[in-house]
Amino acid sequence: MRLRFSVPLFFFGCVFVHGVFAGPFPPPGMSLPEYWGEEHVWWDGRAAFHGEVVRPACTLAMEDAWQIIDMGETPVRDLQNGFSGPERKFSLRLRNCEFNSQGGNLFSDSRIRVTFDGVRGETPDKFNLSGQAKGINLQIADVRGNIARAGKVMPAIPLTGNEEALDYTLRIVRNGKKLEAGNYFAVLGFRVDYE
């Protein structure tokens, strides 16, 4: 059985800028240049400005916009003798993160949540695989053992600095149906939300 898994990863985010200032003109204590003179200035207009200083979102550092994770070849007999087959690790690397800091490099109140999107498998904790292979699904787990569910937000991950590696394990698991040899693939997306 030849196993191949493709994961195109999509990153969504936005940066928002907004602020407020609307003081008198000229500000108290400031005089206009002498050559302006009151007779040359019309004082019947007003401009209001507003803005906000925000922390920008992290940037996603990937070698390629489409990560392809090769699960290798697995004999059917290996899957018949257990619940799961091969595992592969992959990471989502975030860089240039600017979050609330309480000194040093400790970013104590900034967290992110990741959501994986794809076609649900036979149970909510599995993703469907396409192709000729039958009887298997894909499962994603984070480093704490939390299992991803299609379209459901995973537990929050605290950020510890301006560069983060979000590590996950992909594994092929049985889905209760009859095993059949063949190729398989899946296309999954993900979303990162900041708190």
From Swiss-Prot:
Span of the signal peptide: 1-22
Annotated SUPFAM superfamilies: Bacterial adhesins
Annotated GO CC locations: extracellular region; pilus
Intracellular or extracellular location(s): Secreted; Fimbrium
Domain of life: Bacteria
GO BP terms, alphabetized: cell adhesion involved in single-species biofilm formation
Keywords from the UniProt entry: Disulfide bond, Fimbrium, Secreted, Signal
Disulfide links within the chain: 58-97
InterPro entries per UniProt: Adhesion_dom_fimbrial_sf, Adhesion_dom_sf, Bact_Fimbrial_Adh_Pro
Additional remark text: Strains of E.coli that cause infection of the human urinary tract produce pap-pili which are hair-like appendages consisting of about 1000 helically arranged subunits of the protein PapA. These pili mediate binding to digalactoside-containing glycolipids present on the epithelial cells which line the urinary tract.
Function, as annotated: Fimbriae (also called pili), polar filaments radiating from the surface of the bacterium to a length of 0.5-1.5 micrometers and numbering 100-300 per cell, enable bacteria to colonize the epithelium of specific host organs.
Similarity comment: family membership: Belongs to the fimbrial protein family.
Name of the featured protein: PAP fimbrial minor pilin protein
Organism in which the protein naturally occurs: Escherichia coli
Gene name of the encoded protein: papH
